[in-house]
């Protein structure tokens, strides 16, 4: 992002950094990378920060681990049109089952990839079930709706049937993550879903709570200083570029000089360096 973009979305990111205990640079990377993958802009950074704050505070995970998960699955989620909220909800539910960070990321990526076609499930009690993943116009249904329909079907299966269907649908590596989503308790689903879909000012509220202790205040101060550095960096960049350009010009001139001239300059420089201490000693002697 350009500096103007970074500054336009810095407030929400700064609140998230303060709330999570992460530094501003790390939090900014998490937010900007995910927003880009979802096709969102800097103006959405405040809302995305709120979603992360709400999910991490209502599930067994944190902002850093969620950021790692988004790194793997956000490009696929964005391409399929899945929302940030639904993706964060699924990440939070996986976190409750101990599946976090890159493990959750690879699982989510595989799950989403395998939801591009109709989901076909079977069991002794439910028979053959087909769950549509697309709308009539060809667009993807919401991730939460697809998973909700899958949970209904899985609710009528034996444990062995659940494992077999999960492996068939998403593969061995991702089946543990998918089963975590299928076996999530209704109250946990309602808690995380309610939090991410009603998350306005969640990052700010968490940051305000953090300000009640020294660690939180220091984190906020550090974030504010980093924001100030970004602002000053933008203002000073023209001057710095001018200085660097001038130095490059001097170096070019020196490089273009004949070797004889370079040797003379080097000898003069060495003599000047040697004469300095001598002149100081002479000056002190004469002053006695």
What residues fall within each predicted segment?
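Low-complexity, glycine/alanine/serine/threonine- and acidic/polar-rich repeat/linker tracts characteristic
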Residues: 1-5, 9-26, 30-47, 51-68, ...
């Amino acid at each position: 992002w350009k500096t103007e973009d970074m500054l336009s979305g810095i407030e929400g990111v700064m609140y998230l950094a303060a709330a999570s205990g992460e530094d501003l640079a790390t939090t900014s990377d998490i937010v900007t990378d995910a927003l880009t993958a979802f096709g969102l802009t800097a103006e959405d950074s405040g809302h995305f920060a709120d979603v992360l704050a709400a999910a991490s505070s209502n599930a067994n995970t944190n902002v850093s681990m969620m950021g790692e998960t988004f790194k793997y699955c956000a490009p696929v989620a964005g391409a399929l049109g899945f929302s940030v909220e639904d993706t964060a909800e699924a990440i939070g539910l996986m976190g409750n089952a101990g599946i976090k960070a890159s493990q959750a990321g690879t699982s989510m990526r595989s799950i989403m990839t395998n939801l591009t076609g109709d989901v076909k499930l079977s069991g002794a009690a439910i028979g053959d079930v087909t769950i549509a993943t697309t709308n009539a116009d060809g667009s993807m249904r919401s991730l939460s709706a697809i998973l909700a329909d899958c949970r209904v079907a899985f609710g009528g299966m034996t444990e062995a049937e659940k494992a077999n269907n999960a492996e068939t649908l998403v593969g061995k590596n991702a089946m543990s993550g998918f089963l975590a989503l299928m076996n999530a308790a209704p109250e946990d689903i309602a808690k995380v879903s309610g939090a991410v879909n009603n998350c306005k000012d969640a990052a700010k509220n968490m940051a305000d709570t953090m300000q009640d202790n020294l660690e939180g205040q220091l984190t906020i101060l550090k974030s504010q200083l980093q924001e100030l550095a970004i602002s000053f960096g933008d203002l000073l960049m023209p001057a710095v570029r001018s200085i660097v350009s001038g130095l490059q010009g001097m170096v070019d001139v020196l490089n273009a000089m004949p070797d004889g001239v370079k040797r003379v300059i080097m000898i003069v420089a060495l003599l000047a360096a040697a004469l300095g201490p001598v002149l100081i000693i002479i000056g002190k002697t004469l002053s006695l």
